[in-house]
């Protein structure tokens, strides 16, 4: 159960299940679907580790890509994700529910079919909301609290044993080259690719280095 509660599907199902129950109890209730916070939770499960809000008051957002963190203007790419990827997620869920409903027996499974219809109706309303400016603004506001990292600025580029290159991160402590990860908290980069030193490929460079070191530290 603990693992399930950390999945996107778990939170998405909650947004359409709790509200569909309300609709069944009160058919005249023109619900808009789940609350802004509930939908923001789905977004957080989708993108935790890829986005961070470093300043809730001023709306400062960062995105992890290409092995390091980049600051993004007002979280524009996250807002676009609400309009595109998150809507697609709900649309796929609608298709899944409709296909399941078709497979049920119209008579013996009538209650189950009605329950699915209620979920589909709620999901459709959420899909509509995810394309509305005001709704997206409210979801972004709720997302600030969820994605907020109060120690983000303190951790940025604070590890002296890590060096970010265009194609990965050199970890001097572990003596390895690896993909960057969000927990590295790197923003600065050499902007050049790292290549392992090989005698065949870097023969002349190795010779120059040895020559330089011998002159710098001559053997007596």
Question: Where are the model-predicted features located?
Answer:
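Replication-associated primase and helicase/ATPase modules
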Residues: 1-48, 93-125, 201-202, 211, ...
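Extended, Lys/Arg-enriched charged tracts that mediate electrostatic binding to polyanionic substrates
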Residues: 25-42, 120-169
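Noncatalytic partner-interaction/assembly domains of nucleic-acid and motor enzyme complexes
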Residues: 32-99
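Generic detection of long, well-ordered alpha-helical segments
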Residues: 29, 33-34, 75-83, 113, ...
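A broad, structural surface signal
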Residues: 41, 80, 84-91, 141, ...
């Amino acid at each position: 159960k603990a693992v399930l509660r950390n999945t996107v599907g778990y939170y998405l199902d909650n947004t359409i299940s709790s509200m569909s129950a309300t609709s069944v109890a009160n058919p005249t209730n023109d619900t808009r679907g789940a609350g802004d916070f509930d939908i923001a939770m789905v977004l957080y499960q989708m993108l935790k580790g890829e986005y961070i809000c470093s300043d809730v008051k001023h709306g400062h957002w960062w995105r992890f890509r290409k092995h390091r963190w980049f600051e993004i203007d007002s979280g524009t790419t996250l807002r676009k994700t609400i309009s595109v990827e998150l809507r697609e997620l709900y649309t796929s869920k609608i298709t899944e529910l409709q296909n399941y409903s078709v497979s049920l027996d119209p008579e013996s499974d009538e209650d189950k079919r009605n329950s699915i219809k209620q979920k589909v109706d709620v999901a459709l309303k959420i899909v509509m909301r995810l394309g509305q400016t005001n709704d997206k603004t409210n979801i972004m506001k709720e997302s600030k609290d969820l994605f907020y990292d109060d120690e983000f600025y303190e951790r940025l580029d604070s590890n002296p044993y890590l060096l970010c290159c265009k194609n990965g991160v050199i970890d001097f402590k572990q003596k390895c080259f690896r993909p960057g990860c969000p927990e590295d908290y790197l923003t600065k980069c050499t902007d050049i690719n790292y290549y392992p030193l090989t005698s065949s490929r870097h023969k002349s460079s190795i010779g120059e280095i040895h020559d330089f070191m011998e002159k710098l530290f001559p053997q007596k």
